[in-house]
Each structure stands twice: as structure tokens, then as C-alpha cells.
Regions:
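Exported/periplasmic ABC-transporter solute-binding proteins
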Residues: 24-50, 54-61, 65-71, 78-81, ...
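Leucine-biased recognition of intrinsically disordered, low-complexity hydrophobic segments
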Residues: 11, 15-17
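N-terminal signal peptide c-region/cleavage motif recognized by signal peptidases
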Residues: 18-23
Length: 255
């Protein structure tokens, strides 16, 4: 059961229907950018096992904060090594289970299907492209997609010119929604999120060296003892899950 982006404490995400006899329920806290891939993976895993998976989706910062406050979760998949580091520093990861699972890239998307491509480089007149419009981004000081986007703009010398026009959203899917709804002409999102949108067009990809590497670590949380959580973590590295991640455009990192 996938739960959409969280606007109230994630503790509620652990409330689900009772699992079948002999089955176990696994609560997965995952970055919002994994929405589409995890929906497919959850369905396949539940069909292959007797277990039930509850997926709570939000910005990695929100999820990490809730885990550190005692939210009952079994698996954490972050879009940022920093937020996984914070959870690990509190002793909340099962030792030896952390793995760098996936990679991603960030892109500039435009509303509609007829936007012209641009070369993302230091002399890009992004403010000119925006005109009087807004640039949709996830929270630039908290959510990984926003942090990566701001770092890329800053590294290219573009941030100061567009900062007043940035419209911040709670997570990357919400930022993308600003663009697909026509509320912002442009946005910065993960390439994988852009691929899932029918009413937005990728007009440029940010150079990989303009921002820190985008890595999604996953780990078994030590906060609860649910044997099936190790099974699900292994499944995330197996062929079915890897194929689902690849279909959404993620780079596979874990062997």
C-alpha cells in the first residue's frame, strides 16, 4: 500500500490493515522521487511473498526527522546520503545493511510539450527564460532535489539571478506538479520524475559536475525487529526491482 506525500507526522504511515496470517508487514519510508518505481516493486514483492508493504513517501528530510523522533519504520530509502548519515549517527541503522542503491540526475523541465531545448551552462539566461514566471524547486535547504538543484545553479553562477523567482515545494513531486499544472513555466526535478510526467518537457540536463553526486542509500532500520525487512532489502537489489528502477531511469549502483 503506497501512501502519497506526507503532510502530517509520518507516524500515521504505520497504520495499515492487518496482514494475513503468517505474513509480516513492512513499513518503508522512501523519498518521494521513488513513487512510481516503488509502486511497481511493492506489487511484485507482495505477489511473490506473503508479506504486506506499506510505503510512506515524502521528502528525505521529513522522513529522517520522523525516524529520529521514533516513527515505526523498517526500511529507509533516502535521496541523500546526508540524511541517511543523520539517521545512522543516531544509531538507528541495523549495522552492515546500508547500501548505495541508486543514482539519478537533475534536469530543467518546462510546462507543455513545445518548449525549446537549452544548453545548461554558465551563460544561460535562465532569468530571461522565466520572464515573470517562477522556477519550481523542492525545498532548497532541506529536500535533496532542491539542495542538488541549488548547488547546480550556484556552481554555474545562475543562482543569484533566479533566487527571487524560486517557488519552493515540500518535495520533488510537488515541485513537478507546479510545472505540469502550468503554475510555473520551468522547474528543476530529477530526471526520473520528469520521465513520469506527461505534461512537462525536459529541456536540459544539469552537468554532473555542477552538483554533488546524487546517491540513494537504503538501509534496514534498527528501530523494529521485523524479519521480513531484510528480505525486502534484498529484493530491492534483485533483478525484478533493478528492472523497475531502470525503467524509471535510475542508475543502478548496488551490485
Amino acid at each position: 500500500m503506497v501512501r502519497s506525500s506526507i503532510s502530517r507526522p509520518v507516524l500515521a504511515a504505520a497504520l495499515a490493515l492487518p496482514a494475513a496470517a503468517g505474513a509480516e508487514e513492512i513499513t518503508v519510508f522512501a523519498a518521494a522521487s521513488l513513487t512510481t518505481a516503488l509502486a511497481e516493486i511493492e506489487t511484485a514483492f507482495e505477489a511473490a511473498t506473503d508479506h504486506d508493504v506499506v510505503v510512506a513517501l515524502a521528502g528525505s528530510s521529513v522522513l529522517a526527522r520522523q525516524i529520529r523522533q521514533g516513527a515505526p519504520a523498517d526500511i529507509f530509502i533516502s535521496a541523500s546520503t546526508d540524511w541517511m548519515d543523520a539517521v545512522e549517527a543516531d544509531g538507528l541503522l541495523e549495522p552492515g545493511t546500508r547500501v548505495d542503491l541508486l543514482g539519478n540526475s537533475i534536469v530543467l523541465v518546462a510546462s507543455g510539450s513545445d518548449a525549446a531545448p537549452v544548453e545548461i551552462e554558465p551563460d544561460l539566461d535562465l532569468a530571461g527564460l522565466l520572464g515573470d514566471g517562477r522556477l519550481a524547486m523542492a525545498l532548497v535547504d532541506a529536500v535533496p532535489a532542491g539542495i542538488y538543484g541549488k548547488a547546480a545553479l550556484d556552481g554555474l553562477g545562475l543562482w543569484d539571478a533566479v533566487a527571487p523567482q524560486v517557488a519552493q515545494a515540500d518535495n520533488v513531486r510537488a515541485a513537478l506538479a507546479f510545472v505540469t499544472a502550468g503554475e510555473a513555466p520551468y522547474g528543476i526535478v530529477y530526471a526520473t520524475d520528469a520521465a513520469a510526467a506527461d505534461t512537462a518537457t525536459v529541456v536540459g540536463t544539469f552537468p554532473a559536475d555542477s552538483h554533488p553526486p546524487i546517491v540513494y542509500p537504503a538501509a534496514d532500520l534498527a528501530t523494529r525487529d521485523v524479519p521480513a525487512e531484510a528480505e525486502f532489502l534484498d529484493y530491492l537489489r534483485g533483478p525484478e526491482a533493478r528492472a523497475a528502477f531502470e525503467r524509471q531511469g535510475f542508475t543502478l549502483l548496488a551490485p
